[in-house]
UniProtKB/Swiss-Prot annotation:
Full protein name: AP-3 complex subunit delta
Signal peptide bounds: none
Similarity comment text for this entry: Belongs to the adaptor complexes large subunit family.
Membrane topology: Peripheral membrane protein
Organism expressing this protein natively: Arabidopsis thaliana
Function: Part of the AP-3 complex, an adaptor-related complex which seems to be clathrin-associated. The complex is associated with the Golgi region as well as more peripheral structures. It facilitates the budding of vesicles from the Golgi membrane and may be directly involved in trafficking to the vacuole. It also function in maintaining the identity of lytic vacuoles and in regulating the transition between storage and lytic vacuoles.
Length: 869
């Protein structure tokens, strides 16, 4: 009595879902605190024995889980209890909670099997509906296997409300339990002949999903689908049938010829835009070889494009993008409308128009379309502006710049892109500047000019997104300095004070490029001092006319400028900048004194000429493009064993792997001590090189012999390190003039020039495909099994259908009878062969697995429907 009174009191004072929502809107505790208190209250209420109290608590928990992501997996057993209630209101709340929270790993999943079976057999159609909806959402292999008989029964229900939901749940049952196809598929196909539009819509929807997964398995049902296409007047049913035929026509060309006329008829007569668009999409994607149908579809697309509704306009552009690969003339006919759509307010319309413009690009119109797009990029928002830039870059660089004839024009276009205010595609432009330099020799003079104009543009230094472009420009200026008209101005641009705005990694590239320029200028100067080789040196490089223009004063001035600019960087905080700066300053310290004293530089044995000649050799090797798959082609050397587990490091390193004691010296002290010991040892070895080797040397040699695979090659690189900012004045005032000439947006490509040679790789330049397909292997295997089951069911159905047809109609044509007898003879012969094989193989294996039987039956020839012949 006490427990009963307690449950009544709990139910009386329990807050309903409506009270919870009102309290949530008026709460002052904060959202998280209120939800925590509500969940604690629900945990207490859901333990009540009264199902009304329990169901109300479960209802509130479902609300919190749906809107606020509260975990409700802990209430799984309580949901099973509520479902078992005889009241429909409680049952509905329980099924909702199960649908919302159950998954394949739910521990109490098996407890609902009998309850779902009971509800599927209920006389109340609404309870049956709840069970079917739940099964369609959480159905597992076990549930599908155990409930297949009930689903089969409901497929023949006289209640339309129940039958359409049973048809919908069949798809989930087929996916989870493939043997259900043998039981339910025939009855599912029979529903294609129903006159009830709701049931027909449901069954066509199921076959639409099956055809998407595997069109081949649905091909024998083409006559039934064709009948629906011709007879149905329900637009949504027709749309689904069109989706089915769009898949089937791709694998059976004769089917396209058969369905083209009914589809065109629907396009002519219907006023429903949704049906017209689906007809258009079916024609342009699957019936593109039918010229009359394509022309009608393009005319309908034109009607979509001129609509004021942005949704219809987008659909028209989307249809044009589908038809573009095979019928580019359709896009060219609507070019003006597509260009006009670039200024539409809807971002989706603009994006689709951009994709269409890029589909039209070829070597004849790339300049015109690029000019149009650059104008739109200047006045577009940052997001769409960068989408335009990326599209142009992708189209122009496709297949090693196959549509670019005039690379001087294209490099100027890249410079123009860099100056667009919203440009954030610095890395893409950087890649193309370097890539063109490595691939196209004839483009290097213009590349150097564009790079110099980029370096002296002060606006680019303050934009973080454009720093990669400046990095590429600096590298190009140093790598191809022989094409520079004035190396002195290049050095000024590389060492200008505003380069302090750049990150250290790019600043290091600036310094290294200045080093390359200095080496080139000194090399040219020394070459010009040699009387026997001065004329030869002038002709050695077709791109450089600067061999004889360097004088003693200009070289000395250049050295002083670089020394002045890099001096402060010898104490720079970044180690790479510091190291590169000290490398250059060390080189200058070697050659400056000889140049300043005007020694006889005609003597090849001077220290300056020797060092310069060596550095020229270092920088003389040209870089070329490298395939993205080059690393994969490197063969592992014979005898090399890379152990996955480096467990033997303890044996090799010994005591060095022991943990450091807490009272030992610090890590920094150890490093300093080790470095000082190494220096002392080097000095001792230098002073006593003739003395006998120490015992440690022999031990080291023995250790290296035993564990040589863990040693690097012994090559010493003695380099200094340092760096910081420069206060050298800006480049000369002619920079703006020259940069404007380089980035003239009205400049057109010179079509009369022959296309320069572009270096291509033998295995292509495409990037390696990411292994995303591996994640879909299990899904593909499941779809394959389902496909085999459907094909087996269709073969059985077709055999019975053909037999009934020819036996029941003695007046059938002679050709059909011959075809039928041929198929039966073929099947009988196949059966005889299988029996013989089975007798021969009885000694080794007496039984064939069920999967092998399915594969054998699915591999039989699919009968092509007669209406295609």
């Amino acid at each position: 009595m006490s427990s009963s009174s307690t449950s009544i009191m709990d139910n009386l004072f329990q807050r309903s879902l409506e009270d919870l929502i009102k309290g949530f809107r008026l709460q002052l505790l904060g959202e998280s605190n209120f939800i925590s208190r509500a969940v604690e209250e629900i945990r207490r209420e859901i333990k009540a024995t009264d199902l009304s109290t329990k169901s109300t608590a479960l209802h509130k928990l479902s609300y919190l889980a749906a809107l606020h992501g509260v975990d409700m997996s802990w209430a799984a057993f309580h949901a099973v209890e509520v479902v078992s209630s005889s009241r429909f209101q409680h049952k509905r709340i329980g099924y909702q909670a199960i649908t919302q929270s159950f998954n394949d790993q739910t521990s109490v999943m098996l407890l609902i099997t009998n309850q779902v079976r009971k509800d599927l057999n209920s006389a109340n159609e609404y309870e049956v509906s709840l069970a079917l909806e739940c099964l369609s959402r959480i159905g597992t292999h076990d549930l599908a296997r155990d409930l297949t008989p009930e689903v089969f029964t409901l497929l023949g229900s006289s209640k339309s409300f129940v039958k359409k939901k049973a048809i919908g749940v069949v798809l989930r049952v087929f996916e989870k339990y493939h043997d259900a196809v043998k039981v339910c598929f025939k009855r599912l196909v029979e529903n294609l002949e129903t006159s009830d539009p709701q049931i027909l819509s449901a069954v066509v929807g199921v076959f639409c999903e099956l055809a998407t997964k595997d069109p081949q398995s649905c091909l024998p049902l083409a006559p039934e689908f064709y009948k629906v296409l011709v007879d149905s007047r329900n637009n949504w049913v027709l749309i689904k049938v069109l989706k089915i035929f769009a898949k089937l026509a791709l694998i059976e060309p004769r089917l396209g010829k058969k369905v083209a006329e009914p589809i065109c008829e629907h396009m002519r007569r219907t006023v429903a835009k949704s049906l017209v668009f689906e007809c258009v999409r079916t024609v342009v994607s699957s019936l593109s070889d039918n010229e009359a149908a394509v022309k009608l579809a393009v005319a309908k697309i034109r009607e979509f494009l001129v609509e004021d509704d942005p949704n219809l306009k987008y659909l028209g552009l989307n249809a044009l993008s589908i038809v573009a690969p095979k019928h580019l003339w359709a896009v060219l006919e609507n070019k003006e409308v597509v260009v006009k759509a670039m200024s539409d307010e809807d971002p989706n319309v603009k994006l689709e128009a951009l994709h269409l413009l890029m589909a039209m690009v070829n070597e004849d119109n790339v300049s015109e379309i690029s000019r149009i797009l650059m104008n739109y990029a200047l006045k577009s928002d940052p997001l769409f502006c960068n989408e335009i830039i990326f599209s142009v870059l992708s189209a122009c660089s496709r297949n090693a710049y196959e549509i670019i004839v005039d690379f001087d024009w294209y490099l100027s276009l890249l410079g123009e892109m860099a100056r667009i205010p919203h440009c954030q595609r610095g890395e893409d432009i950087e890649h193309q500047l370097i890539d063109i330099g490595m691939r196209v020799r004839d483009a290097r003079p213009q590349l150097v000019r564009v790079s110099w104009a980029l370096l002296i543009d002060p606006a680019l230094l303050g934009n973080l997104f454009l720093h990669p472009i400046l990095s590429a420009a600096a590298w190009v200026s140093g790598e191809y300095v022989e094409f520079s008209k004035n190396p002195y101005e290049t050095v000024e641009a590389l060492l200008q004070p505003r380069t302090d705005l750049l990150p250290p990694s790019i600043k290091a590239i600036y310094i290294h490029s200045a080093f390359k320029v200095l080496v080139f200028c000194l090399g040219s100067y020394f070459s010009s001092q040699e009387p026997t080789s001065s004329s030869l040196a002038q002709e050695s490089s077709s791109g450089s006319l600067l061999v004889n223009v360097f004088t003693h004063e200009s070289i000395l001035s250049l050295v002083n400028v670089i020394e002045l600019g890099l001096g402060p960087l010898s104490g720079y905080h970044d180690v790479e900048v510091q190291e590169r700066a000290k490398n250059v300053l060390g080189y200058i310290s070697v050659i400056k004194q000889e140049i300043a004293e005007q020694l006889n530089l005609q003597d090849n044995e001077t220290e300056a000429s020797r060092v310069t000649a060596f550095m020229e050799d270092v920088f003389s090797e040209e870089f070329g493009p490298i395939s993205a798959t080059a690393q994969e082609k490197v063969c592992v050397p014979d005898g090399l064993e890379l152990k996955e587990n480096l467990g033997d490091l303890e044996e090799i390193c010994g005591e060095h792997l022991k943990p450091v004691e807490s009272d030992s010296v610090s890590y920094t002290d150890k490093i300093s001590f080790s470095v000082s010991k190494l220096r002392i040892r080097d000095q001792q070895e230098a002073t006593s090189s003739s003395s006998p080797p120490h015992e440690a040397s022999s031990l080291l040699a023995e250790h290296r012999k035993r564990h040589g695979m863990y040693y690097l090659t012994s090559q010493k690189e003695d380099q200094d390190s340092n760096g910081t900012s420069s206060d050298y004045p800006l480049a000369n005032e002619l920079a703006n003039e020259i940069s404007q000439d380089s980035f003239n947006p009205k400049r057109k490509p010179n079509q009369s020039k022959p296309r320069p040679v572009v270096v291509k790789l033998d295995d292509g330049d495409e990037s390696r495909i990411t292994p995303q397909a591996k994640t879909n292997i299990q899904t593909a295997n499941d779809d394959e099994s389902l496909s085999r089951a459907i094909q087996s069911a269709l073969l059985v159905k077709n055999k019975g259908k053909e037999k009934d047809r020819y036996e029941g109609n003695p007046n059938s044509g002679q050709q059909e009878k011959e075809e039928s007898s041929r198929i039966e003879n073929h099947q009988n012969s196949e059966k005889k062969k299988k029996k013989k094989k089975k007798k021969k193989g009885e000694g080794s294996s007496k039984h064939k697995s069920r999967r092998q039987n399915e594969v054998a039956s699915a591999s039989e020839q699919v009968i092509i429907p007669d209406f295609l012949l």
